Amino acid sequence: MKKSLIALTLAALPVAAMADVTLYGTIKAGVETSRSVAHHGAQADRVKTATEIADLGSKIGFKGQEDLGNGLKAIWQLEQKAYVSGTDTGWGNRQSFIGLKGGFGKVRVGRLNSVLKDTGGFNPWEGKSYYLGLSNIAQPEERHVSVRYDSPEFAGFRAVQYVPNDNSGKNHSESYHAGFNYKNSGFFVQYAGFYKRHSYTTEKHQVHRLVGGYDHDALYASVAVQQQDAKLTWRNDNSHNSQTEVAATAAYRFGNVTPRVSYAHGFKGSVYDADNDNTYDQVVVGAEYDFSKRTSALVSAGWLQRGKGTEKFVATVGGVGLRHKF
């Protein structure tokens, strides 16, 4: 009897050790079809059409925490892409970190979402195609190997983040990030910005984004304004590249169905080529149907036009997919 109890206790030890580890993830894939046309003068050339089975951003992760006493906890997460199409591999290629959490907030080190990326709720779309989401305004959003501090919820302040020079990739460009978040009765205001210097193509680069909206019960609505400015290192270019962009998204849940629509516009800014028109308009519409709390069907369509008149690029795309969370 004693031997049986010992064996049972030993068998339970690995389970106890794993008790604070959570396995989670999302599997999502679908079919997308697209058509794009580049217009030059009176001619339409570079016509491209494509239909493909696409992974829509599947992932798998492990996370956990340990109580260290006196209100202090060790926290960790290891998250990676897990494409069902088999086109991506590697560990820790999504948000992965180790850190400490307590009354002071939390400090993490690893591959972390930028503060700017955490304000991307106005772009809820899930698709592989560049045109099935607000990809232009979302372009500066990244994950950095960095150290990040997130404060407790007080006075609206939220986070600061630093990317060291030697962790910024081949460009060797350190960057500084900061943001705040204020919420009250469903209304919210978010700000995020970053400053980067000494990269290969730019001497200085800064982005500022302000997002405001309402998110409560069945209704979500938001407006985002973003301004980018870059001082270029190439002497034969204009001294600055800059652009202001706006985006708006609205969604409302009717039972198991959540339709949504987004619109984005990029105003004409200064670019390396004075003849290059960097204005754009984009519309994405779609809906989700929830079969259960974990499984949903996705359908969406997008349209983008960059430039105007006889010099423009136009793309349309549609997609359907299935998503399961675990």
From Swiss-Prot:
UniProt cross-references to SUPFAM superfamilies, sorted A to Z: Porins
NCBIfam families: porin_porB_Neis (NF040479)
Subcellular localization, as worded in the UniProt entry: Cell outer membrane
Assembly: Homotrimer.
Organism of derivation: Neisseria gonorrhoeae
Main location: membrane
Function, in words: Serves as a slightly cation selective porin. Major antigen on the gonococcal cell surface and it may have pathogenic properties in addition to its porin activity.
PROSITE patterns in the record: GRAM_NEG_PORIN
Gene3D superfamilies: Porin
GO molecular function: porin activity
GO BP, one annotated term: monoatomic ion transmembrane transport
The encoding gene: porA
Family membership noted in the UniProt record: Belongs to the Gram-negative porin family.
Any one GO CC term of the record: pore complex
Membrane topology: Multi-pass membrane protein
Record protein name field: Major outer membrane protein P.IA
Residues making up the signal peptide according to the UniProt record: 1-19
Keywords: Cell outer membrane, Ion transport, Membrane, Porin, Signal, Transmembrane, Transmembrane beta strand, Transport
PANTHER family hit by this protein: MAJOR OUTER MEMBRANE PROTEIN P.IA (PTHR34501:SF9), PROTEIN YDDL-RELATED (PTHR34501)
Pfam name, any one: Porin_1
